[in-house]
A protein has these predicted regions:
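Long, compositionally biased
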Residues: 57-72, 153-194
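Amphipathic alpha-helical packing elements
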Residues: 103, 107-156
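Aromatic-anchored, charged helix-turn/loop surface patch used as a conserved interaction hotspot
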Residues: 61-113
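Surface-exposed polar/charged interaction patches
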Residues: 29-36, 117-121, 145, 153, ...
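Structure-specific DNA junction-binding interface
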Residues: 1-84, 222
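Intrinsic-disorder-associated interaction segments
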Residues: 4, 15-19, 96, 100-103, ...
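Exposed alpha-helical structural elements
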Residues: 44, 146, 167-168
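Short, functional C-terminal segments
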Residues: 172-225
Length: 225
């Protein structure tokens, strides 16, 4: 049953596990100093990742939305990627925050869960994965084998979500490090604001920002949106 309470709870657990794995890879790369060299905006964030403890990463992973992205807002990219997959075409890949064999299983599971949500929980897939409605439709049409091939061909498209918003990441790690649940809830609110802006831009509509006066955003609130 679409959007049943059990389905949403299971999806939230899945999202948290994906976030944990993604953050662990990001922290490992930050400690090795071989990540984000070309992203000057992340210079201030790398120290937070490099010294993050397991408990800090675990708390940060509680964000009710995926902290990973695979061009989920780029309708044109997905249309071209699917066509290229069928034709065998290739193009030059852009620099990614994730690389190496460890990223492939993570990207595969991210896309598989996004595909599953697009097919059975389409009304919440935009919130949880940040998918534009048209991307949701495209992903839902794929087969598991299509996903396997796409991951291998386009692994470098796996990126941190809101990669160009370093302030969000700084707020997230500060709140997770300080063991401050109220600050974490404010970060969740920031997530919703960023998501609202993304969805509004894909539809060509102005976005009215959510204000703190509406109360803190918890996982249950985000799930019910």
């Amino acid at each position: 049953m679409e959007n049943s309470p059990l389905s949403v709870i299971l999806l939230n657990t899945t999202v948290r596990h994906l976030n944990e794995r993604g953050l662990a890879l990001m922290a490992k790369a930050a400690r090795a100093c071989d990540w984000a060299a070309g992203l000057s905006s992340w210079k201030e964030i790398r120290p937070f990742l490099a010294r993050a403890s397991e408990s800090t990463l675990s708390r940060a992973s509680r964000c009710p939305m995926t902290l990973l992205d695979f061009n989920f807002q780029r309708v044109t990219w997905w249309s071209r990627a699917i066509n290229r997959q069928n034709s065998g075409d290739s193009r030059q890949r852009s620099l990614s925050a994730f690389h190496g064999d460890e990223a492939i299983p993570l990207a595969h599971d991210l896309l598989l869960e996004a595909w599953s949500a697009a097919r059975s929980l389409s009304s919440v897939s935009s919130l949880v994965f940040g998918m534009a409605p048209e991307v949701t439709t495209l992903i839902a049409q794929l087969s598991p084998r299509d996903i396997d091939q796409l991951v291998v061909q386009e692994i470098q498209e796996l990126r941190p979500r809101w990669e160009t918003r370093p302030m969000f990441w700084k707020e997230l790690f500060q709140a997770a490090t300080q063991m401050d649940d109220e600050n974490l809830e404010n970060v969740y609110l920031h997530c919703l604001q960023l998501l609202g802006g993304e969805l509004a831009s894909t539809r060509g509509q102005p976005f009215i920002s959510v204000t703190a006066a509406q109360g803190p955003v918890t996982e249950a609130t985000a799930q019910a949106s």
